[in-house]
Amino acid sequence: MDGIKYAVFTDKSIRLLGKNQYTSNVESGSTRTEIKHWVELFFGVKVIAMNSHRLPGKGRRMGPIMGHTMHYRRMIITLQPGYSIPPLRKKRT
C-alpha cells in the first residue's frame, strides 16, 4: 500500500522545514505506523514523531446537484537531527 500521495507546500509547511518537519497528504485509510515504516524504508531516515489530522472534503455544486470532494489525511513527519528528505524536483516544461 503506497500511503503518501504528495508533499504539501504551504506557508506553514515551508516554515516547518526549518524544524526538520515534513508535511504530506496521505491516504485516509493508512495508519501512522504504516506511514512511519514506509518513510523510513523508502527515504532511509529515522522518524521520531508524527502528527496527523483529517481534513474534510469541500462541497462542490454542479447546477442543482450538490456534491463533495473526498476527505484526506495530512501528516507532519518529524525526523531526527542530521536526517533529511531530498527535495522533490518539479518537472520543467
Curated annotation (Swiss-Prot):
The keyword Cell inner membrane does not apply. One of its GO terms (biological process) is translation. It is found in: Plastid, Chloroplast. One of its GO terms (cellular component) is chloroplast. Pfam families: Ribosomal_L23. Gene3D superfamilies: 3.30.70.330. It comes from the Eukaryota. One of its GO terms (molecular function) is mRNA binding. Its main location: plastid. The keyword Plastid applies. Binds to 23S rRNA. Part of the 50S ribosomal subunit. Belongs to the universal ribosomal protein uL23 family. This is Large ribosomal subunit protein uL23cz/uL23cy. It comes from Cucumis sativus. The lineage of its organism: Eukaryota, Viridiplantae, Streptophyta, Embryophyta, Tracheophyta.
